[in-house]
Structure formats: structure tokens, C-alpha cells
């Protein structure tokens, strides 16, 4: 075995289980050998039996897979099985023409059995059965499966952007990690490749059916010529001998072909669920006893018609009635939902204490009673786990751990309603429907879907609540489809990011400082509280978070404060110098991996006018402020159309003023100063404010 590995330039230390990599090349060599070399009848029997067994195995694997990607090798297997059948046809044709004059067993026992036993030794019946099998395979199964594969490939490719956006949404919301996102993206790509391959592989099966008809005609004509001209047989004897052998050969090849075509149809028509095809069919066909009763009634009426086979119809009527009775009895025996136990009221009046004073939670969520299963682990609720992932991801990205989200039910809310509170005040609310999916239109979705129209609570996009059965259709049409718990988690993540500065209190500042002291004890000991008070540090960090600047790089922040705090105590001025020190991180945040940055700029006369207003201390004139706001809004729209970040680049002295003024009306706007941008980036002004 090691010598063989050396000859084939394979690793010498291949394990016995790794020699399966040679299965493909060996199979191709065997198929080519069958086409070229004459085979004895016994070997042909073995190969025909192997072909039948292989087709049955492929069909059963297709039936028991729960997702199409579990049988991603099916298009390749389809090609190999088609080649195997054609090679068997060539080998059997050779032996039929060479030895057909010797008798019915010339091509082996399998061909003889299919030619005599299955069709009673009558070649006319055999031809009819063979043609019917070919028509079923070619006109019905193969044509339908090919069309489904073609449409499925197109729809899967059209739905790829929506699926990718859903993966990105889960990743951004902290619901999945980077590894899981890569795995899901890979599965989306594999699914597209699979359906594209199935679109082409279905042509193999159709070609195989056509080849079967042509091979049968050629075998019959060739057999007649060989029998009459070479072996001196009579026309009738030659026709009977060679036609029966040809029919047996055709049937033993077409029956596995029909089985493989059925497997192809099962693969492309199945819906991906956690059940295999058999479970889906049984559960959906026999789930409703009313259907059984109506079917029994129809069969019973037919059974009472004179001249009909009454016994057969009435027998099936009784069977359906019994099945309906059994299904209904099983439904009635299903355990009912436990009723909530009402607690006995305690009329004893207890003196109020300070423990009765309820402090407001920094962050909370209230849910209606229909959403309780989403936050209950015992009912497989996923929301608590998603919230933990959100807090962890937020801490890794922004640099501090947000408060714990306290969740409680609120019977005053609508059943499917939830609301998110910060310090007791509602900052967001929405509806969620467990068991249904939110199809979000990113602006490129095609067509409409039946369902309840709504708006995505996090980003304000048009959306529709749809049933689970429409999920794949929505993805194909370009919608981003997410489940109910993901909707709530994404909304919460968005609000936490928006209110990061308010969630970062003095307690969080002290906890962060204690964490930094574990890594940099000398720096924190020298700085706080001797040079910078905790109040000033807290305010600087809050200012950074207010403009979406992460505070992960605490070393740079503290060292910058240690340098400038002795000569400047104003938190806003200190924030400005810290931002300059964090310039590389800020640039990377908004322009990752780009040498050329596309930003909005200020017209020079307008910049000069704003600097004069800033130095004079009189503020902006109302007319100038209105024009500045309107032109900034127009420039932001152009940035969005170009796919560029919403960044306005201004003079360092103007940045605090413009940031405070513009972000009141345009919270998505990011105002950067020229000193905060990395020197190695090329600046390109995509829009200029002023000059009008």
C-alpha cells in the first residue's frame, strides 16, 4: 500500500480510512474498463445488482436527509450513477450481440430474469413496459425535477443577499460569533452551488432516458442483423431472442434510473426542516382527523354505487374512519397546559420599611404575556441568552460592560408588546410574535408577502410579520428574515448603542478604573485622583461614548489626560485632545482598510464665517443655522447613495460646536476634525456644505 501511495504521489502515512480519496478515480477507471473490455456474464450480474443496490441507497439517503446540504454530493453521485448505467448498457450490448444466439442466459441471470420473469417472456409486453417506464422517467419525474432545480437555483441565487444580510444582522447584534457567521456564510454559498449543480445534473438524467430508448432500438436492429446474417437464425427466432435480451437489459437499467430520478425529485422538492421527508409527509397528511372523515365519506359513497367493487371501497372507508378516531383520541389525550395557581391573599398588613423603596433599574424590559416563553429557559426561550451575548459583544467593542437588563412581565401591555426602559423611562417599544418571522425589506426586495405589515423597530425599515411556511419564499424574494427573539435583541442592542453615554455612570467609571488598575497600577495610581478627579474622567469618557467613540484604549486615554490635565481641567477641552490621541482608532472605526476616505467638507468662506462666529461668542445666526442644517441633510443623502460613512470633516476648532448643533437633528452624523484623521489617508470630498 505504501508503494502504491509513492507511485501515485500520495502521502505515505495515509490511514486506512483515508484511502477513500481514491474511490472516485477507481470508479472512473472501472467505468471506462466496462466500456472497453468484454465482461463475463457473472461479472455483469454483479454490476447490475450493484447498480440496483446503489440506486436504492441513494433514494433512502435522499428520503432521510433533513437539509439539502446533508447530501451535497448528490449532483456528483448523479453523474457517476448515470455513467455507470451507460457503461453497463455498453457492456451488456456487447455480450448480447456476441453471445445472444446461444440462449436467454447469454447476458447473465439478471438480464434473463428481467426479460422473462418480469414480462412473462413476451417481448411485446416487454417493449410496452419499457416504453412506459421511459416515459414516466423522462416526461414526468425528470422534467419536473429539472424545472424545480432550475427555478430553485435562480431563487436561491436571488435570495443570497437577503440571507447574507440576516447573518450580518445577527453578527452585529451579538447573537452569533465570527466563527458561526463564517459557517453560515459558507452554508449559503454551498446551497447556491448545490442548486446550481442540480440544475445541470438534471440534464444527465434526461439524457440517460433518451439514451435508453436509442440503445434499445440499436440493440434490436443490431441483434436482428447479427442473428440472421452471422448466425443463420430465422427472422422470428432472432427477433424473439435478441428482443427479449434487449428488453431485459433495458429494464434492468431503467428501473435504477427511475429510482435515481425519484431521489433527485425528492432532493429538489423537499423543504428544509428538522424532519426527514417521511416524517413531514406523515405528520402533514395525517394530522387532521377531519380530512380522514371526509375522505372516508367520499369512499363510502363510491362503495355504495352499484357495479363498483364495494368490498374494497368499504374496507378503505372503515380504515380511514378508524384512523380518524385514533388521531382524534390522541389529540384529546394530549396534556393540557397547567393553569396558573392562584396564590392565597394575605390580609396581614406589614409595616412599611426602607426595603419597600424600589430603585429604578438602569436598564429594563417589560413584556406582554405572549412573550413570556421567549424569556423562560424552561420553555426554550432564547432571548436571555441573546441578551447576554449582546452585553458581551458591546463590552468588547465599546470598552465597558453595560448594566444588566432586568426583565419582568407587565399584564397592562398588549399580549405581544414589549418595551425597553432606561432608569424607568421608556426609550423604545415594539411588537413580537413568537413562532412567526419578521421579513425586513432592505429596499431591494421583490414582490409582496401575505402577513401583518409593520416597521422594523431598530432601523425603521418596512417589514412584514409572516408565517414560518413563507420564510424561504421571503428569502428568495430578497427579504432579510429574522425570528421574533432576534427582532427584540437587535432592537435592544441598537438602543444600548444609542444611549451608551447615559448608561455609563460613575459606578461604571469606577469599575472600569478598577479593571484598568489591574493591568496598569502605576498609571492609575498617579493619575486618579491626584491629577484627574473621577468626576472629570467620567465626563471625558461619557463625551467619547456620546459620539460613538469606543473607550477600549484606556492606556492612550489615561496617558493623554496625564499629559494635559495639569494645564487644562475643562472636560470638553480634555475630550478634544483625547480624540486627537485616538485618531488612528477613530479613522479605523469609520474607514476600515481604506486608503481613500470619502467625507463631507465645509466650503472655505463658510468655515471662515463659522470661525468668526465662534471667536465672537455670539453663536450662529438663525438663517445661517437653517441653511447649514438643510445643506448637511442633502450631503448626508448623497453620502448614503454612494455607500460612504456619514462623516463630516471640519476644522479642529469648529468640531465641538458643529457636533453639538448638527447631531441634535441628525443623530447619525459623525463630525471629525482634521487632526483626528490619520495622516496616511487620502481625503476625497464627496460633498461640500456652503457656497449657496
Curated annotation (Swiss-Prot):
Q: Which InterPro entries match?
A: FHIPEP_1 (IPR042194), FHIPEP_3 (IPR042193), FHIPEP_4 (IPR042196), FHIPEP_CS (IPR025505), FlhA (IPR006301), T3SS_FHIPEP (IPR001712)
Q: Does the keyword Transferase apply?
A: no
Q: Which GO terms describe its biological process?
A: bacterial-type flagellum assembly; bacterial-type flagellum-dependent cell motility; chemotaxis; protein secretion by the type III secretion system
Location in the cell: Cell inner membrane
Keywords, A to Z? Bacterial flagellum biogenesis, Bacterial flagellum protein export, Cell inner membrane, Cell membrane, Membrane, Protein transport, Transmembrane, Transmembrane helix, Transport
Q: Does the keyword Nucleotide-binding apply?
A: no
Q: Name one GO cellular component term.
A: plasma membrane
Q: Which residues form a coiled coil?
A: none
Q: Which residues cross the membrane?
A: 24-44, 46-66, 71-91, 95-115, 121-141, 209-229, 247-267, 296-316
Q: Say which domain of life the source belongs to.
A: Bacteria
Which family is annotated?
Belongs to the FHIPEP (flagella/HR/invasion proteins export pore) family.
Family matches, as NCBIfam families: FlhA
Explain the purpose of this protein. Required for formation of the rod structure of the flagellar apparatus. Together with FliI and FliH, may constitute the export apparatus of flagellin.
Recorded protein name is Flagellar biosynthesis protein FlhA
- What organism does the record attribute this protein to? Escherichia coli (strain K12)
